[in-house]
Amino acid sequence: MAATRYEPVAEIGVGAYGTVYKARDPHSGHFVALKSVRVPNGGAAGGGLPVSTVREVALLRRLEAFEHPNVVRLMDVCATSRTDRDIKVTLVFEHIDQDLRTYLDKAPPPGLPVETIKDLMRQFLSGLDFLHANCIVHRDLKPENILVTSNGTVKLADFGLARIYSYQMALTPVVVTLWYRAPEVLLQSTYATPVDMWSVGCIFAEMFRRKPLFCGNSEADQLGKIFDLIGLPPEDDWPREVSLPRGAFAPRGPRPVQSVVPEMEESGAQLLLEMLTFNPHKRISAFRALQHSYLHKEESDAE
């Protein structure tokens, strides 16, 4: 299906992943989001998409069969213009008007009600558990790629496309935020699905605070801000193969979660700490977080 079938309406934004347009499907009248990214020419006879791109798109199309309510739908993929070096691929997603950043900013003081936060978190974790069960690590969760529909449905976006996006990102001089990155990513250690649960913890705290939890300006500065809250981890938990030694950071103990998220009750603080656990092998999974008592009890002291 050709990308020209869709009529661009407005530019939504420009990011590390390229330019995003809101467009209209004239056949259905529905709005869609168009993301055009460049991928390297596969180099086979006559060119073509790289095998890695074909595999990633095939996996995402398979996920469509499940129609998970908390995952943005990939409706179409079109390879359009090409050169000797690269091919422009247009990804057609369902269009959602706002992201979590906008949703939080629009909430009147003092912010979102606790029960709304719990509902958002249950949906967020449900979508993420679905991705993890299908062996997809998001790797870049942040409020800007968690979308919220007008009726409060959470949908995860920009997942499963890491290899497709990597070429475009190398061409785009956009600073990728470190604020939601797990320690193992900051240390350039090996990583898997637990990296996403660290990001979930940062976003969970931000729903209460209405501002990011850790705002570092370099990998080392980000780690320092993390250790200011959770304490310097023990030597046994420090990954062996990284260039930044544990000794580069001053010893310090943990602080109470309520010192940075005073509105959070004790069981919520306990869940947050299970997400913000330094050792990824000890970090709570999306599946286990969904079972946590905090997300299933009414707020006892709700105002």
From Swiss-Prot:
This is Cyclin-dependent kinase 4. The modification N-acetylalanine is found at A2. Residues 50-56 are annotated as: Required for binding D-type cyclins. Its main location: cytoplasm. ATP binds at I12, G13, V14, G15, A16, Y17, G18, T19, V20, K35. The gene is Cdk4. SUPFAM superfamilies: Protein kinase-like (PK-like). GO terms for cellular component: bicellular tight junction; chromatin; cyclin D1-CDK4 complex; cyclin D2-CDK4 complex; cyclin D3-CDK4 complex; cyclin-dependent protein kinase holoenzyme complex; cytosol; nuclear membrane.
